[in-house]
């Protein structure tokens, strides 16, 4: 049995003074020796925390004693250690950012909830568009079979992508999904205000679908990206597959790294061998960038040799 747990949760509810709440909540979390990342806004709370089983259970009881969060659902993962290095509770304008001119309140408008078994039926329906509401790098390491991959790098780009592809989605049944459900609460509501009529969402997100005793994560390919030190977690308990592809050679891969150029920091899938071969950098420009954190540890001679090994030249050698 694991000694630690990771809790994923959110709740759209009114918080009158997010800044004061954040300070008090941070103090409470630290007292319970939790680590994690929590966003607080006037519209609610969105968090992931890790801690010992005893500490996380205490936290869930603590939240249940607050009427605003008494019915909040926690997605619970067993873990061998903390999933975060520190504890942060930050006040924000939104708990998920769509950055709309007119914000959407999921308590007033949101898509129809589909439970995991209903969502599985939708996955098998050829007349339904399954729309991934996550970022491109989240999709690339794992997604539902047949889902549409929006070409976006952050959530606030999604409405623009929808408008650009409106003709392909018009008059279609749309079912959207995300990690734990919070993004879809707001996004599905926006879809309805934007004129799409038949809009549904996976209730509780991928995390809930993967733990459901009937679906057991079936029809999910790859792993689910998570925003903590675990990076990705398994979902499909029936017939797991690998869909991630190494950025450099296209071979199956589920290992994410960040480009060593801090001005880039792009997340790419790469094996240990290719990380070393390509100097943990996504491009030649990033490899030769003076701020590159990987190449700073190399001597000039070794840097030149490593570049030549992949048929590249250092700037100093260019005439």
Curated annotation (Swiss-Prot):
Keyword tRNA processing belongs to the record: yes
Catalysed transformations (reactions): uridine(34) in tRNA + AH2 + O2 = 5-hydroxyuridine(34) in tRNA + A + H2O
Rhodanese domain: residues covered: 124-218
EC number(s) reported in the record: 1.14.-.-
GO biological-process terms attached to the record: tRNA modification
SUPFAM superfamilies xref list: Rhodanese/Cell cycle control phosphatase (SSF52821)
Active site positions, chain numbering: 178
Pfam families in alphabetical order: Rhodanese, Rhodanese_C, UPF0176_N
InterPro entries, A to Z: Rhodanese-like_dom, Rhodanese-like_dom_sf, Rhodanese_C, TrhO, TRHO_N
Gene Ontology molecular function terms on file: oxidoreductase activity, acting on paired donors, with incorporation or reduction of molecular oxygen
Keywords: Oxidoreductase, tRNA processing
Family that this chain belongs to: Belongs to the TrhO family.
PANTHER family, A to Z: RHODANESE-LIKE DOMAIN-CONTAINING PROTEIN 7-RELATED, THIOSULFATE SULFURTRANSFERASE/RHODANESE-LIKE DOMAIN-CONTAINING PROTEIN 2
Protein task: Catalyzes oxygen-dependent 5-hydroxyuridine (ho5U) modification at position 34 in tRNAs.
Protein name (database record): tRNA uridine(34) hydroxylase
Gene: trhO
């Amino acid at each position: 049995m694991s000694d630690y747990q990771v809790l994923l949760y959110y709740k759209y509810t009114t918080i009158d003074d997010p800044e004061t709440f954040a300070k008090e909540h941070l103090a409470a979390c630290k007292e319970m020796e939790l680590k994690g990342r929590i966003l607080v806004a006037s519209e609610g709370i969105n968090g992931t925390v890790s801690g010992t089983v005893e500490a996380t259970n205490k936290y869930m009881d603590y939240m249940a004693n607050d009427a605003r969060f008494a019915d909040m659902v926690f997605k619970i993962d067993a873990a061998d250690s903390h999933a975060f290095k520190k504890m942060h509770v930050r006040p924000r304008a939104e708990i998920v950012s769509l950055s709309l001119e007119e914000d959407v309140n999921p308590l007033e408008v949101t898509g129809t909830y589909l439970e995991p078994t209903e969502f599985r039926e939708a996955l098998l329906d050829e007349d339904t568009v399954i729309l991934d509401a996550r970022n491109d790098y989240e999709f690339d390491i794992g997604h539902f079979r047949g889902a549409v991959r929006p070409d976006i790098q952050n959530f606030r780009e999604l409405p623009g992508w929808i408008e650009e592809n409106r003709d392909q989605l018009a008059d279609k049944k749309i079912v959207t999904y995300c990690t734990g459900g919070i993004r879809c609460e707001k996004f599905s509501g926006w879809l309805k205000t934007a004129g799409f009529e038949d809009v549904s969402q996976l209730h509780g997100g991928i995390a809930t679908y993967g733990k459901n005793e009937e679906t057991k994560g079936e029809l999910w390919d790859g792993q689910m990206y998570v925003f903590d030190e675990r990076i990705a977690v398994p979902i499909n308990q029936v017939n797991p597959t690998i869909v991630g592809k190494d950025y450099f050679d296209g071979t199956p891969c589920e290992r994410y790294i960040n480009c060593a150029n801090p001005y880039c920091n792009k997340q790419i899938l790469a094996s240990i061998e290719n990380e070393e071969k390509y100097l943990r950098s996504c491009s030649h420009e990033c490899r030769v960038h003076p701020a590159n954190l990987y190449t700073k540890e190399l001597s000039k001679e070794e840097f030149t040799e490593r570049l030549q090994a992949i048929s590249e030249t250092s700037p100093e050698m260019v005439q």
